[in-house]
Amino acid sequence: MRATPRDLSDERDRAAHTLERSSVISTFEKLGLRPPLQAALLDLGFTEPTPIQVLAIPPALEGRDVLGSAETGSGKTAAFGLPILQRLMDRPRGKTRALVLAPTRELADQIAKHLMSLAKHTNVKVAAIYGGVGFRPQLNALKRGADILVATPGRLRDHLKQRTARLDDIEMLVLDEADRMLDMGFLPDVRRIIAQVPAKRQTFFFSATLSAQISGLVREILRDPVRVELAAKIAPVKTLSQTLYAVPQEKKTDLLVELLKDNNIYSAIAFTRTKARANRLAAALEKHRVPVNLIHGDRSQSQRTHALEKFKQGQYRVLVATDIAARGIDISALGHVINYDVPLVAADYFHRVGRTARAKASGDAITFVSSDEEPLIRQIEHTLGKRLERGKNPLFPEASTEPPKPRVVYRSRPRRR
């Protein structure tokens, strides 16, 4: 039975009710996970499940399809990874039985590494295939055998065309950040891939939003899903400070350079709306001798990996990024997020600022707002349910904290003769 809109609404109500279990289920043992998985979680320093894990793992262990909404850093990977690992441990077959689709190379790599850590005390093998790196090493990994395959749609389609990968034995399918996959134009590839996966399977579907297009795909591929949705997903943590600065568009770089004179900003990701703006900002910061690098879709995989690793090591003070390129990036000690450009949709704002103030640490989110971006900020504030703090722009200390209104020039009509 396929999911219908009414079914999804019913599941939302059930999920809200089920959230009460998070105060009852306080250990991974109570979730029904086997000792090898509990040992791996302990090795990773995880002593109690997150809310998304409390909601998703029990129905997943029962074989139910799961439709979920959860942010980066919520424990989402373990929410689908642990049930998959337990099932593979119970009935090992030596074939690729689980497929995880992710929109970007960075996210696919991050998921694969996390699953490998969770599988540490098992015989389950994990492989990742994605574009931007050599085809041969990934082909060799597939030949060695993998119980779980993590892939981006484009590279997986390449392997399927060359018949170097098969999906005949897939029992568990995961679509992570499905909304982003569709935004990036992967829907045709995703449909072709799913068509090669057996209809009799368990499906996990995670998406930050449920647009008409996403809802249509949900109805096609999910069967009687349990919906798990955290109402707190749009509420930044209390340790996060959020400040707006009113600034003309042409003065944004000057403002950022001025703010960087504060040595407390030692590690920051600056988000731009486009790749071209990311390039210009990085070049401008270099001229001011700010240690900076950037990641976006036009950078090679090796360039992106190098930039991220050196940023984590502290060799770069600022990492300039676009939203799509930054999805899947996990930096545990990020002090600041700077919205150089206000995102076009509120969901991207929460994705951005959610990268700082993690694990009870404090963090700062700074947003530059030009007059034409004020409607976007109002949308974000409406979603938040509160007005964000306005800071004094150090470039114009005596000016208003509100963005200047666009100047309207009225021209007198020529007199009729």
Give short role names for the model-derived ranges.
Residues 2-8, 14-401:
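Conserved helicase RecA-like core
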Residues 398-417:
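Dual-mode signal for accessory low-complexity, basic/Gly-rich regions
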